[in-house]
Regions:
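Solvent-exposed loop and edge beta-strand segments that line ligand/cofactor-binding
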Residues: 24-37, 92-115, 158-175, 180, ...
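Short, small-residue-rich loop/turn micro-motifs
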Residues: 17-20, 42, 307
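Catalytic cores of carbohydrate-active enzymes
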Residues: 39-157, 196, 200-228, 280
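Non-catalytic C-terminal accessory modules of carbohydrate-active enzymes
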Residues: 132-135, 160-165, 177-328
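Short clusters of hydrophobic/aromatic residues that line enzyme substrate/ligand-binding pockets
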Residues: 13-16, 83-84, 143, 217, ...
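Active-site lining segments of carbohydrate-active enzymes
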Residues: 1-30
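Secondary-structure boundary elements
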Residues: 10, 53, 72, 187-190
């Protein structure tokens, strides 16, 4: 947090520097990254909770001061039906809706939801545009349209063919964020759709298309403009496994731990009758039975812990026993 707050640009958002995650997007010391700004906003929410737990009211008050200011900067990044990607050092917008190329980027949309910043309307609108513009049979593209004629000096992805690598390819790590964002919105059907599209195992019968081993994520997959659409590259060199794990466990399965216990909020395909989880949690064993007789995508109607009805969908650690049986 301190690192980012010490490196703010003209719009009081974190500088993009040499790269913000996207190795081919050089926004510079004065350019700014909306993606990182959302991550910073999220980090502030998390660290404030820990500060309060520790009795550090001074730091919590600091967050209360700077987070709304960052929120104002992020609100200015909303462009009709999407969040922009950021600002160049000269103040020019990257990822504006009117841009002829690279006008829609995945990460700002998914992280606007994950961070908790986007309003309900913004979140629904932005993620619907993600599905409309960026989704493919092989996963969700990093951005669209790819750079061909209208790139700037810091957009190094233009050296790659359209729909390849950072130039409109399907980056595996971002799929976990898209899965999590849709899950947080309660869109179980779409979250699972994104999981299946990008799942290596789901391409078992198309090995000649995917090429990579069916048990490992690659860095990226070529998208629909490529003559090799669906082919994946750069195995064993990506943070995708952990990102998709979070998207599936905390998102689709809805197991969301916090300092006090466990929130249970599944977002599943409406066709599922339910599922069961055996989970070790802080020295306790949890047997969790998720039942979906009404075939909805999300929303907890009732929950019992060891036969006792509890309000809402939160299981306090103080109520957990060595063997805890939970029915949702």
């Amino acid at each position: 947090i301190n690192f980012s707050m010490e490196r703010l640009g003209a719009h009081t958002m974190p500088a993009g520097l040499y790269a913000d995650w996207n190795d081919c997007l050089r926004l510079g010391k004065k350019g700014e990254s909306t993606f990182v700004a959302f991550q910073l906003y999220y980090a502030m929410s998390i660290i404030k909770g820990y500060a309060l737990d520790r009795g550090d009211n001074e730091y919590a008050a600091y967050i209360d001061k700077v987070q709304p200011e960052l929120g104002k900067s992020l609100e200015a990044c909303w462009d009709e039906d999407r969040f922009i990607r950021g600002y160049r050092e000269n103040g020019e917008i990257v990822g504006a809706k009117k841009d002829p190329e690279a006008s829609m980027w995945l990460n700002p949309q998914s992280w606007s939801v994950i961070s908790g910043f986007a309003s309900d309307k913004q979140a629904e609108t932005a993620m619907e545009k993600v599905h409309e513009i960026l989704n493919t049979p092989f996963g969700v593209k990093i951005m669209e349209p790819p750079y061909v004629d209208h790139y700037f000096d810091g957009a190094l992805m233009h050296i790659f063919n359209p729909d390849t690598k950072e130039n409109g390819g399907i980056f595996s790590q971002t799929q976990g964020w898209a899965i999590l964002a849709e899950s947080l919105l309660g869109h179980g059907d779409r979250a699972f759709e994104y999981f299946l599209e990008s799942s290596p195992a789901n391409m078992n019968d198309k090995a000649e298309v995917r090429i990579l081993e069916p048990y490992v994520h690659g860095q990226f997959t070529e998208s629909t403009r490529s003559p090799y659409a669906g082919r994946s590259h750069v195995h064993w060199l990506t943070g995708t496994g952990s990102t998709v794990m979070v998207g599936c466990v905390e998102g689709i399965c809805g197991m969301r731990p916090n300092a006090e216990g466990l929130v249970i909020s599944p977002s599943i395909p409406h066709t599922w009758d339910g599922f069961k989880i055996e989970k070790n949690f802080r020295g306790k064993h949890l047997s969790i039975d998720i039942q979906n007789p009404d075939h909805v995508q999300s929303g907890v109607k009732s929950m019992t812990v060891n036969g006792e009805a509890v309000e809402g969908n939160f299981v306090c650690e103080c109520k957990m026993t060595e063997q805890t049986n939970i029915v949702v």
